[in-house]
A protein has these predicted regions:
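Secondary-structure boundary elements
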Residues: 180-255
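Extended, well-ordered protein cores
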Residues: 174-177
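Solvent-exposed soluble domains appended to multi-pass membrane proteins
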Residues: 182, 186, 222-223, 327-336, ...
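Intrinsically disordered, low-complexity N-terminal segments that are enriched in acidic
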Residues: 27-171
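Hydrophobic alpha-helical membrane-insertion segments, chiefly the h-region
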Residues: 18-28
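N-terminal Sec-pathway targeting helices
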Residues: 2-17
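A short, highly charged nucleic-acid-interacting micro-segment common to nuclease
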Residues: 252-266
Length: 346
């Protein structure tokens, strides 16, 4: 303080320099953020055929793939309830299978797999929720919850050791479907299909990949509403039926029919539109690198253009952090988000 009193001019000069440097750094950052690798990429024609979505399935081992195909078939055939896996798996394998089932194309808005159990019906995550700590092949059974099941609102009961004590009752309630609810699922599938076709009809036939991306993002911005913190609403839910109706419903392509979607829902809609427009696209999950050590789960959509992989923020929820950019290079994306490490994304 005494120095400042004695050297007012020097102190003022230092303050001016600091302000100028700060302004320069801020200007440089804005300039860098405004320059997009995406803008520099050459336009590229779209494919003529619908792109197959097998990014995750193609990375599964034979063992994991067998369980994946089994669960996918049960889901599509609406065979809910307790299911015994063809191949017992460890925690990492289970997570890879469930992730592939969740992200791989099919619009399973009406159901999901959960409650991994041992052969003796013990819920393996009863005490410790970290599935990756399960290193032995002890996951032999799971439960497929379907919104059309008569007993979808039944709650599980657990013994002190984690055994599902009312599993027989759960199985009976989840293995029988209500015809009216099945009809509702089929109706919504048709409505979703019609909406996807309507969106694609607005895309010029001669448009390239970049033009298609811009069109899909603009459509989502103008026609969909973001569901704020859907996961937070899980508090107070009594059963899996509540989860399906109030949270899970917004995580799928079928959320088009409600004009509301979560970050995951936006990403799935965008990728599905890309596939139908002849463009390879897959979801990339990870942890967003926020400030002060904070992190949250987030989703990008990866699209191949001009020999590079572009990462698209379909929901636009990180618009402010990204300086208004919606399409990032791989380097930019990895600087912003730590990709999940149980699949290969490069």
């Amino acid at each position: 303080m005494n120095y400042i009193r004695k050297h007012k001019k020097a102190a003022l000069l230092i303050a001016v320099v600091v302000v100028v440097l700060f302004a320069f750094v801020t200007w440089q950052r804005k300039l860098t953020m405004s320059k997009s690798v995406y803008d520099e990429l050459k336009e590229e024609p779209r494919g003529e055929a619908v792109e197959k979505d097998d990014f995750y399935y193609s990375q599964l081992t034979a063992k994991e793939g067998e369980d994946f195909l089994f669960l996918k078939e049960q889901m599509e055939n609406l065979n809910g309830g307790v299911l015994e896996l063809p191949q017992p798996v460890n925690g990492k394998e289970y997570q890879r299978i469930i992730t592939a089932l969740e992200y791989e194309g099919a619009d399973n808005f009406y159901g999901f797999v959960d409650i991994p159990m041992t052969e003796d019906n013990v819920y393996v995550l009863y005490e410790d929720k970290d599935v990756f700590k399960i290193t032995e092949d002890k996951i032999s059974k799971v439960i497929l919850f379907l919104s059309c099941a008569e007993g979808i609102h039944l709650s599980g009961e657990f013994a002190e050791d984690g055994m599902v004590s009312n599993l027989e009752k759960i199985q009976k309630g989840l293995s029988v479907n209500e015809e009216e609810k099945v009809a509702e699922i089929e109706k919504r599938q048709k409505e979703t299909e019609a909406l996807l076709e309507e969106i694609l009809q607005g895309l010029p036939a001669d448009s390239g990949k970049k033009e298609a991306i811009d069109y899909f993002l603009r459509w989502l911005d103008e026609n969909m509403e973001f569901v704020q913190k859907a996961a937070a609403t899980t508090e107070g839910m009594q059963n899996m039926g509540d989860m399906l109706e109030k949270v899970y419903d917004f995580n799928h392509v079928a959320s088009l029919t409600k004009k509301k979607a979560s970050t995951l829902g936006y990403a799935k809609i965008f990728s599905e539109l890309c596939h139908r427009a002849g463009m390879e696209s897959h979801l990339v999950m990870g942890s967003w690198n926020g400030g002060w050590g904070q992190s949250e789960m987030y989703i990008f959509c990866a699209v191949s253009i001009d020999g590079q992989t572009v990462y698209v923020d379909a929901s636009g929820q990180k618009n402010a952090s990204l300086g208004g950019k919606r399409c990032l290079s791989e380097k930019e994306a990895k600087n912003r988000m730590t990709f999940a490490d149980y699949f290969e994304y490069s």
